[in-house]
Amino acid sequence: MRTNRRQTVKFATPHTPTSSPSSAAADTQAAAGRPFLSSFLSYAGGQAHAVRIDGASLQVEGGPAETASHWTLSGHGGDLVLRPATEGARPAPAAHGLAALDAAFAAHPECRDLAMHPADPQALAALAEAGVVLPAADGIWRACRDTLWQQPGLWRPGVPPPMAQRFALTEGRYHPRRAPKPHGLLYQRYIPWLGRTFTFRSLEIDEDLPRFNRWMNDPDVAVIWEEEGDLQKHRAYLEGIARDPHMHSMIASLDGEPFAYFEAYWTKESRIAPFYDAHDYDRGWHVLVGEPAFRGKAFATAWLTSISHYLFLCDARTQRILGEPRIDHHQQIRNLDKSGYAKVKEFDLPHKRAQLVMLLREHYFYDGLWMPRT
């Protein structure tokens, strides 16, 4: 895992709500040092859904539905209840229910589950089949935060079916065949503390080469990556990754503005495989933040939690994500530690001494590691 070392931007000001909520939820979040969430974007079904939160009321708009749906979120702590605002009203689309759940958990990040009363039996059945809601002893269905965040359709447009398992041998390493490289928009997520939408898209060499070349020649990037050079060198670099079935390149953006380059890879076929007991679906990643204005704690938290989430969503069989930052890259190791990555060991690669770190799927989802940790 490589990333440019220098962090030059102070913590960004969180998104400020435009209205003043009057509910007890506002006081609870203010006491915890978080801004009250009055608006939210959810991408259920690959489409943007705007959610307005006013006290105990939620309004969901967007997607294929022509009208908004209205919900109430009552209770507090572990006793939250989400239900349609009007009994007997036309059932809300399933995507609206997912968007309402997404917003409810974002507004109450301390909550691991809540009671849910969908108006549509078919929507309830779909949520139950996906594991988003589970029957409780009292006969009430409970929506679970950790299983909701494992639903690819909330963050990945056009989710392909999982790749059937068949094995191959590459340079003496026996591993599953990998799915074709993804293209286009790969992941989208609203970041509440920035008030902006984070996205991953596939890198397009002709479009992104000048930007990639500029980033690689930035002194703060070059000190870590050591890949300075001209356009020809960097085209060859990207074409090499495009030919490698175990890696793919991505561009990260905030509200459509590109700021970082990522490489995602399967570790079983990678250079770190000989240094630990690699499992068939372990993933790893590299990053460089090319735009100086996007370096800093608030941005690092956004992209670090998002790359982990994206890789876990790509395949439910991925149980671990690995990293190998330089041993002297203390800031990045601290960031990884705060994001749930555990130190495994130190080891030597040809170009660096590295710290092997690992994030477990259960730890990420159960402990809600998509939110900032202090």
Q: Residues of each region from the PLM?
A:
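Conserved acetyl-CoA-binding loop-helix of GNAT-fold acetyltransferases
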Residues: 92-106, 296-312, 334, 338
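Conserved acyl-donor/pantetheine-binding loop and adjacent beta-alpha core of acyl/acetyltransferases
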Residues: 268-289, 293-295, 299
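Conserved beta-hairpin
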Residues: 4, 14-22, 27-78, 82-85, ...
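A short, internal acetyl-CoA/4′-phosphopantetheine-binding micro-motif in the GNAT/acyltransferase core
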Residues: 81-95, 285-297
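Conserved beta-strand-loop-alpha-helix junction that forms the acyl-donor binding cleft
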Residues: 116-125, 322-333, 347-351, 362
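C-terminal "cap" of GNAT-fold acetyltransferases
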Residues: 149-155, 349-374
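Conserved GNAT acetyl-CoA-binding A-motif
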Residues: 104-122, 313-325
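Conserved N-terminal entry element of GNAT/NAT acetyltransferase domains
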Residues: 1-49, 162-206, 368
